Structure formats: C-alpha cells, structure tokens
Design a protein with these regions (language model features):
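Reverse-transcribing Pol proteins
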Residues: 15-138, 215-222
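General helical secondary-structure elements
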Residues: 12, 79-81, 156, 175
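An acidic, Ser/Thr-enriched, charge-mixed low-complexity segment/SLiM signal
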Residues: 1-22
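Alpha-helical interaction segments
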Residues: 5-6, 25-33, 168, 191
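Reverse-transcriptase-like RNA-dependent polymerase core
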Residues: 41-70, 111-119, 134-136, 142, ...
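Generic low-polarity alpha-helical segments
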Residues: 1-3, 32, 205
Length: 222
C-alpha cells in the first residue's frame, strides 16, 4: 500500500471517467431482472465507489464559532494500525479523501465489530458542536404512510454508500480533516456522523424526485 502523493489520482475527472469493469457488469446482470437491465449502471458498485461531481446540494458546513481544537493522535496497536492504513488506502483510491494541511483535525477511533474486526470512525463531535444546525424539514412518518393509502404494489430503493454520494461543498473540505500518525486527510464526500448530514441527504433526494414526491415516490431515511 502506497500512501505517498505519487499514488494519488492526477485529477478527479480521471477517476470519475473510468470505464466500467466487465466483471462487475456480469455480476450485476446475474441479479438484475431482464426488464431493468437497460438501467444496469445504477446498480453498479464500481460507479457507487467513484467520486461524484459537485451539485447544488453539496453539504455545507457553517461554523457558529471558532474552529474545533486539534485532536490528539493516540498510540495504536498493530491491528488498529493495519485497519487505519486500509481505511486510508481504500478512500484515497476512491478519491473520497486527500491529504490535508488544515489547522484543525479530529482523531480517529476504533469500534469493535461483532465479528471481531475493527470499524474506524472519525471523532467529529467537537466539529458538530460548533456547526450551525440545518433545520431542513423532514416529513413525519404518519404523513408518509398516508401516501400509501390505496396502493398495493411497492418498490424500495436503497442507495449504496448513500452519504458518500454527496460532495462536501468546495472550500469546506478542510473542516472535515482527521489526523493520523501517517498524515492528515480531509473528506471530499460527506462522511457518516456529520451533523446536518441527514438534512443534506434528504434535500438531495427530494431534489432528484421533486416532481414525483407524494405521487409515486416517498423519501425516508432511518
């Protein structure tokens, strides 16, 4: 695994324009009914793990006060170090993060999974504490259920890596910086755990389905 700058993609556009892997197409075709195979690209794991372009719904981080304090880099055992290196490598490869020189930075913590593995997570509570809250309206569940009245056929669409499909607003990336013993990095996509992330995602999906809301589509996140 190479964490040096020479291993980064030369341009974000190059990463976005990579062609679909034939093996991935074959895998998707086996599980997608023939009726929907004209839309194979929307089922693609490869495309879901590429950096999305900026859009009007990019996640904006507005601070109410000063920058959160810089987090402490804790000592790690070998298992934690291996997991951290894998996380950094995976997200650099996808184009979801890049090196940062931000004057702030959150530490990385590890949570044990049921299978004994480790889940790495950025401790961003101090950033959330100084972020202005987005009061985007979220429809109550009873209103969503009322739309179903009289319907008998339902489809559920679940988005792969949902939050990571949304970009951080240009210029706000440095606020998402996390510090490690290898380097500091910042997110180009909206990571899980950010305050206002649910509101930003609801706004994005509502914008996509604007003309179909409460006609054929309801949007709900849990």
């Amino acid at each position: 695994m190479d964490l040096h700058p020479s291993s980064y993609h030369d341009s974000l556009e190059e990463l976005w324009d990579e062609e679909e892997e034939p093996e991935e197409v074959e895998t998707v075709m086996k599980v997608v009914p023939s009726t929907y195979q004209q839309y194979l690209d929307v089922f693609s794991k490869v495309k879901a793990e590429k950096l999305s372009p900026h859009c009007a719904c990019d996640h904006h981080i507005e601070l109410e006060g000063s920058l959160p304090p810089v987090g402490v880099i804790d000592s790690l055992c070998k298992k934690e170090s291996d997991r951290l290196r894998a996380y950094i490598s995976e997200n650099l490869e996808k184009g979801f993060i890049w090196p940062s020189s931000s004057s702030t930075g959150a530490p990385v913590l590890f949570v044990k999974k049921k299978d004994g593995g480790l889940h790495s997570c950025v401790e961003i509570r101090k950033l959330n504490a100084v972020t202005r809250k987005n009061k985007y309206p979220v429809p109550p569940m009873n209103q969503l259920l009322n739309v179903f009245n009289g319907s008998s056929i339902f489809f559920k669409i679940d988005l792969r890596g949902a939050y990571n499909l949304l970009r951080i607003k240009d210029g706000d990336e440095h606020l998402t910086c996390f510090r490690t013993k290898y380097d500091s990095f910042e997110y180009l996509v909206m990571p899980f755990g950010l305050t206002n992330a649910p509101a930003s995602f609801q706004n994005l999906v509502n914008d996509i389905f604007q003309n179909l809301l409460d006609v054929y589509v309801v949007v709900y996140f849990d």
